[in-house]
Amino acid sequence: MRRALLGTLRRTFRSGHDGRSDEPQPPAEPPKAFYLVGEPGYPNYGDELIAGEWLKFLAARYPDTPVVLDCARPGPAAVILRDRHPHAVFTDTLRRLATENPFPYDGPIDDIAGFVARALRDDGVAPNYACGIRLLQHDVQSVHVLGGGYMRGDWTCNLSRLSIGPWAREQGIPAVGTGIGLMPISGDSLDYARRCVAAFRSFTVRDAATYDALRADKDAAAVTGLAPDDCFINGLDGCYMPPEGLPDTMLCVQSDFVDDPAALYARVERTLERWNVGKDAGIGVVECNPRIDAPIFPYLRDRGYANLRFFPTVELLERGFPARPGQRWISTRYHPHILAAAAGCSGSYLSVGPDYYGVKHGAVLRMGSRWTQIAMTGESPMPGEGFADQGIVQRYRDDIRRSVNGIHPDA
């Protein structure tokens, strides 16, 4: 506002009292930036998918408005998402404030979040990041915390990013959150999240457990809604790899969050046998998190599976997700479940952690998947069907766009 006012005064002074002048006029002030908070850059496919889809949306609707995306690894994120928006800048201001402070990493939320809040108000609290803080203070028109599962109760450094909501309200900057999952969360972390969420103009979550936890507080309940995953913002247009040559059977099986990966892989192998997938059948192994999702490939190879194809993370990021109708999937991960089920694939999921991945897979079932769950004991089920209503993807797109009316009224 101050810069715009000064620009108006300068133009009036040059033009004289009648407001006319033959002199060239200075260029108009550039619009203030959309400020996004997310988690692309590790990479971990779903986070890049969500951030990339929002950047595509903003590039199509507001091509001349700059975007700042605040994430933990802005360097890799900038390269991965380099073609999504013509005026995107990547930074890690909030992440740095959350991790470079006097308190232990993932220590008490009130300590870490208190530091973040003080620094946002006074850049002298964190002078190394004063430029990023001042950008927030002076050059931002809205704040949008993107969806994902990167904030939860025990990841307090990540969770402290919600402090941007109360700060934005103090500054008169509209803030929204979309498609967020906070589970597992309880105690001080939940109290903190409720206080922060109440300051947002709107705040949608992707799972019922997060929804119920936030709505137990009346102020947070007033702005909290239950929504689909952010990946649907553009109706999944352009998210898939060309279907030609993709295997009929696909796996995405992680090794993190698992006490005994070998037992998990053995369970997957027994499920393949139950589904009559022979050792000469084509099987795709999808990696969403580099190295973390790869070990099942040598496990199956060593057991005689001879027609395996590996899909590394970089291929997904560059070419899209390898799902097509007619496939059968086994996945421990959340976004492969969403994208494959939405594409009409049948499948089953394994939950490697009931309070985290169990909540995630439950959210996909609510969104429309009919996949079956594979338990670690007993006979594996046959695969369940994907989304019954293919039109729901477009309705989800419209729902998400309506949820950001507070910052994009023409969305």
What are the residue ranges of the model-derived segments?
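Active-site anion-handling motifs in enzyme catalytic cores
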Residues: M1-A411
